[in-house]
């Protein structure tokens, strides 16, 4: 059962929604669609609704992914919902998600701007890449990200950086083990991923000494809480977006200002001390494009800042919390932990630390990571918008319909996954002789990072972060917890987080760092 957090602001939103609905009864209740196809019987089935608000009460239930899963199991995998007069289609089937992400990818490549726009905010303004419309700016920025940061060649160039950070992380765990101190896995993983992201995109860590690193981590956490509030507020429909802005404007601008001050300082450092051509980071590349009047696309200073905010949030939070979930699953399933450790010791040995280059030779580790992402996708709800009317699963989807793809439900669908709620990495150990269509069927229902053109461009980096972190913690340590099992309760937030911090004590078993130091005095 999930832990649900209800604060005053969310209650206030709900009260305002009800008051607003009374004043707007005639406008919303009697509005008829002008699309003749909507008057046919081609729409997806719809569960019972309430007068005026439609299915709003279902959309505001938390945690959303579990609420949506319950609705779909009762009424079907493709459902037509309504928040006032706003059409919404809920998708809980892998085959229908495939139609959206592949067959009709261009039609659904635009993300519905559920979060209100504040022009002066680098957090929820119009400068971001993630929520940008599909067009020249989005294509240009994605190309830059792939070629300069997230592509295979770029990842190979920054491998040494991540290797050093992994050793620092491992040394910290050995220090905790020596002192018999408890580790908050989520917090320590957030530090590791934040250090990696910062060094990869701007050439240096955020300083722990002057509080800069803690400031970034705090901003990431605060940003995610604001996204949660806005997504819940925005489910009432486009008509209430301005209301949402008025409720949270002070918080948004405060966080945006803190991001702006931090990033402006970093930008000025790069401008005053530009890196040499052979040692350039992402910030250097972006500043060069910003200053180049002949660039393929002219980007602004605020767009650079907004991109870095998105990289901080996406790169830091996703890997940190997914690793926390997977370690909890491994501790709760000691037989799987044992098998994984045996694989690592067979391939890597005991005298050196696991490396990124080992991952391809560790199929069971890959399966463990995939199974963890299947059960605990960081973003369980994916949102798209229909640019034009089309048919999905034989049903008509009207233009401008908001599509909610419940990735959580798709990856726990009992029609597609055997024992869907159980942690079984073996399901991803696909034998080479298995038919190709079986492999495709597996991939069809596996969407932890989304899919299509709007799929997460940092998928490969995410697998690397999570894989080597899990590998290190399993290779070098046993883990002691209070009680027999890790508590697996979820929060009621928009991202899938553990309700209770995953705290455990590392117990050193082998120290490949000591072996390395003895060979390299």
Regions found by a protein language model. Name each.
Residues 1-9, 19-20, 288, 402, ...:
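C-terminal helix/juxtamembrane-tail motif
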Residues 55-76, 261, 269, 355-395, ...:
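Conserved cytochrome P450 K-helix E-x-x-R motif and the immediately C-terminal K′/meander segment
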Residues 2-37, 464:
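Terminal signal-anchor or tail-anchor transmembrane helices
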Residues 309, 430-466, 491:
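Cytochrome P450 heme-thiolate "Cys pocket" and heme-binding signature region
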Residues 112-122, 156-323, 339, 491-493:
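Cytochrome P450 heme-thiolate monooxygenase catalytic core
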Residues 359, 405-437, 520-521:
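Conserved cytochrome P450 K-helix/beta-meander segment immediately N-terminal to the heme-binding cysteine loop
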Residues 36-59, 65-161, 185, 189-196, ...:
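Cytochrome P450 substrate-recognition site 1
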Residues 334-336, 459-499:
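Cytochrome P450 heme-binding "Cys pocket" and the immediately downstream C-terminal segment
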């Amino acid at each position: 059962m999930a832990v649900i957090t209800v604060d005053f602001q969310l209650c206030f939103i709900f009260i305002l929604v009800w008051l607003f609905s009374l004043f707007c009864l005639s406008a919303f209740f009697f509005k008829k669609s002008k699309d003749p196809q909507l008057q046919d019987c081609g729409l997806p089935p719809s569960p019972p609704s309430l007068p005026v608000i439609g299915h709003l009460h279902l959309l505001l239930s938390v945690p959303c992914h579990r609420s949506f899963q319950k609705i779909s199991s009762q009424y079907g995998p493709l459902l037509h919902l309504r928040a006032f007069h706003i059409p919404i289609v809920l998708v809980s089937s892998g085959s229908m998600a495939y139609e959206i992400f592949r067959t009709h990818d261009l039609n659904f490549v635009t993300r519905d701007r559920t979060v209100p726009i504040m022009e002066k905010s680098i957090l929820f303004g119009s400068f971001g890449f993630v929520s940008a419309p599909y067009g020249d700016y989005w294509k240009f920025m994605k190309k830059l990200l792939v070629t300069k940061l997230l592509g295979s060649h770029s990842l190979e160039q920054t491998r040494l950086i991540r290797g050093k950070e992994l050793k620092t992380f491992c040394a910290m765990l050995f220090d905790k083990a020596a002192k018999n101190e408890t580790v908050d896995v989520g917090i320590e993983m957030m530090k590791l991923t934040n250090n990696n992201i910062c060094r990869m995109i701007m050439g240096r860590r955020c300083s722990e000494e002057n509080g800069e690193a803690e400031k970034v981590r705090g901003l990431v956490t605060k940003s995610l809480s604001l996204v949660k509030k806005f997504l819940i507020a925005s489910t009432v429909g486009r008509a209430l977006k301005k209301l949402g802005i008025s409720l949270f404007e002070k918080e948004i601008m405060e966080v945006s200002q803190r991001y702006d001050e931090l990033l402006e300082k970093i930008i000025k450092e790069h401008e005053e001390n530009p890196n040499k051509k052979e040692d350039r980071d992402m910030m250097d590349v972006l500043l060069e494009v910003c200053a180049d009047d002949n660039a393929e696309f002219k980007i602004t200073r605020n767009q650079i800042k907004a991109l870095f905010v998105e990289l901080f949030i996406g790169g830091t939070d996703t890997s940190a919390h997914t690793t926390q979930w997977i370690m909890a699953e491994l501790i709760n399933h000691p037989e799987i932990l044992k098998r994984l450790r045996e694989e690592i010791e067979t391939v890597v040995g005991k005298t050196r630390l696991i490396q990124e280059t080992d991952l391809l030779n560790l199929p069971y580790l890959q399966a463990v990571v995939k199974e963890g992402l299947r059960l605990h996708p960081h973003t369980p709800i994916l949102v798209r918008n229909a640019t034009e009317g089309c048919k999905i699963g034989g049903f008509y989807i009207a233009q401008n319909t908001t599509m909610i793809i419940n990735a959580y439900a798709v990856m726990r669908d009992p029609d597609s996954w055997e024992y869907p709620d159980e942690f079984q990495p073996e399901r991803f150990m696909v034998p080479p002789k298995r038919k190709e269509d079986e492999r495709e069927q597996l991939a069809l229902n596996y969407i932890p990072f989304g899919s299509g053109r709007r799929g997460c461009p940092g998928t490969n980096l995410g697998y690397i972060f999570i894989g080597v972190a899990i590998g290190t913690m399993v290779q070098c340590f046993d883990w002691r917890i209070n009680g027999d099992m890790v508590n697996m309760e979820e929060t009621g937030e928009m991202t899938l987080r553990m309700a209770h911090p995953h705290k455990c004590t590392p117990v050193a078993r082998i120290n490949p760092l000591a072996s390395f130091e003895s060979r390299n005095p």
